[in-house]
From Swiss-Prot:
The keyword Signal applies. Induction: Up-regulated in cells which display transient adaptation to mild oxidative stress by treatment with diethylmaleate, a glutathione-depleting agent. Also induced by retinoic acid. Its main location: membrane. Glycans are attached at residue 34. InterPro entries: Transmembrane_161A/B (IPR019395). It comes from Homo sapiens. Belongs to the TMEM161 family. It comes from the Eukaryota. Keywords: Glycoprotein, Membrane, Phosphoprotein, Signal, Transmembrane, Transmembrane helix. This is Transmembrane protein 161A.
Length: 479
């Protein structure tokens, strides 16, 4: 195994910086707590008592004199004219929030992972080491793993709630996305060029000789079926994870547009960010993407706007730009969520009757206490898509367009199936066979198909969930 050298030094340096600088310099903390976001403070009990005309009894004798052996909960009219004060969201306020430390660590790790990837790409572009392991792949894989962990952490909240409404919604969407994932896999490559068919063909071509040596010819179709079923199950679980982030995104998108009525440029960015999953779906729809740019239907003269390699590079760049665009409009979305406290109070004032003062305070505080969860719901799909894009470029053998794309080896298993010396023991021979089997399975074409499927499917789930969220908040939430 080749020595990592410079890449290992950069990895150790990055890990040290991430550990040492976290208390002093944090992108996640700056994104949420730099003072540009403001939150609403709940009205104090004294203010609510003054509005209700019920001053607090000064002592036990006064309560007994008024016939109150035990003080009843304070209730005020729902339309009481109290005001909600605002204050900047600071780090001191955020440290007590649930999941803030998880949010900070996850986002900062994703930032450092991106920095390692940029250095590695520059290192390979300038020096081109052929025998070194690309350590940025491990950073991206770790980030994808932590993204799934964040999805599990947030989704567990809905399954642990006493009310089963959120749990039912997750299970319903999981079943729906399971059906859609199975339908997507039967779409022809001429329509949806995810690359699953060439990837499976490459895998089976390399696995077939290995299975024949063991007499396991029957396992080849079973392996293909298992991979397709596994991709469908992964799509179902991912769809369940993205259900409530999509619903939340629709709500914050509507509110952010309302808050930015006098800023047309910001509204344009919000619309573009919201429709970014639709652009991602378009990138892999061959008739209206690759074929249209390769042979545009303009006049009788046939010409090509982009070559296949240029289209692949442009697709990678567009994916990165769309992820950065969604990151750029994070604060308008978070501010729109924090303003839900005021909207809930205004909705309360349109109702008749009385309400306990404690419930008013809880309605306001609950919005602020949930802001880190909303931040994770917004940023985790973005980070997952971005790192899958980086993995697609590296493991799929693509290029950024700044240099020639690396050539894909047609038979990677042939290199791993090198003759083993007679002096080597049985353990080394078994390890070599396992390495050959893995090399035949994880071919660049197969990884292209799997990663493209994950990127496309993540965008599809986000789009469907957010569109349903728009319909829900527009027509059903107020009814």
């Amino acid at each position: 195994m080749a020595v990592l050298g410079v890449q290992l030094v950069v990895t150790l340096l990055t890990a040290t910086l991430m550990h040492r600088l976290a208390p002093h310099c944090s992108f996640a903390r700056w994104l949420l707590c730099n003072g540009s976001l403001f939150r609403y403070k709940h009205p104090s009990e004294e203010e609510l008592r003054a509005l209700a005309g019920k001053p607090r009894p000064r002592g036990r004798k006064e309560r007994w004199a008024n016939g109150l052996s035990e003080e009843k909960p304070l209730s005020v009219p729902r339309d009481a004219p109290f005001q909600l004060e605002t204050c900047p969201l600071t780090t001191v306020d955020a440290l007590v929030l649930r999941f803030f430390l998880e949010y900070q660590w996850f986002v900062d790790f994703a930032v450092y992972s991106g920095g390692v990837y940029l250095f590695t790409e520059a290192y390979y572009y300038m020096l081109g080491p052929a025998k070194e392991t690309n350590i940025a792949v491990f950073w991206c894989l770790l980030t994808v793993t932590f993204s799934i962990k964040m999805f599990l952490t947030v989704t567990r909240l809905y399954f642990s709630a006493e009310e089963g409404g959120e749990r039912s919604v997750c299970l319903t969407f999981a079943f729906l996305f399971l059906l859609l994932a199975m339908l997507v896999q039967v779409v022809r490559e001429e329509t949806l060029e995810l690359g699953l068919e060439p990837g499976l063909a490459s895998m089976t071509q390399n696995l077939e000789p290995l299975l024949k040596k063991q007499g396991w010819d029957w396992a080849l179709p079973v392996a293909k079926l298992a991979i397709r079923v596994g991709l469908a199950v992964v799509g179902s679980v991912l769809g369940a994870f993205l259900t409530f982030p999509g619903l939340r995104l629709a709500q914050t998108h509507r509110d952010a547009l309302t808050m930015s009525e006098d800023r047309p440029m910001l509204q344009f960015l919000l619309h573009t960010s919201f429709l970014s999953p639709l652009f991602i779906l378009w990138l892999w729809t061959k008739p209206i993407a690759r074929d249209f740019l390769h042979q545009p239907p303009f006049g009788e003269t046939r010409f090509s706007l982009l070559s296949d390699s240029a289209f692949d590079s442009g697709r990678l760049w567009l994916l990165v730009v769309l992820c950065l665009l969604r990151l750029a409009v994070t604060r308008p979305h978070l501010q729109a969520y924090l303003c839900l406290a005021k909207a809930r109070v205004e909705q309360l004032r349109r109702e008749a009757g009385r309400i306990e003062a404690r419930e008013i305070q809880q309605r306001v505080v609950r919005v602020y206490c949930y802001v880190t969860v909303v931040s994770l719901q917004y940023l985790t799909p973005l980070i997952l898509t971005l790192n899958c894009t980086l993995l697609l470029k590296t493991l799929g053998g693509y290029s950024w367009g700044l240099g020639p794309a690396p050539l894909l080896s047609p038979d990677p298993s042939s290199a791993s199936a090198a003759p083993i010396g007679s002096g080597e023991d049985e353990v080394q021979q078994t390890a070599a066979r396992i390495a050959g089997a893995l090399g035949g399975l994880l071919t660049p074409l197969f990884l292209r198909g799997v990663l493209a499927y994950l990127i496309w499917w993540t965008a599809a789930c986000q789009l469907l969930a957010s569109l349903f969220g728009l319909y829900f908040h527009q027509h059903l939430a107020g009814s």
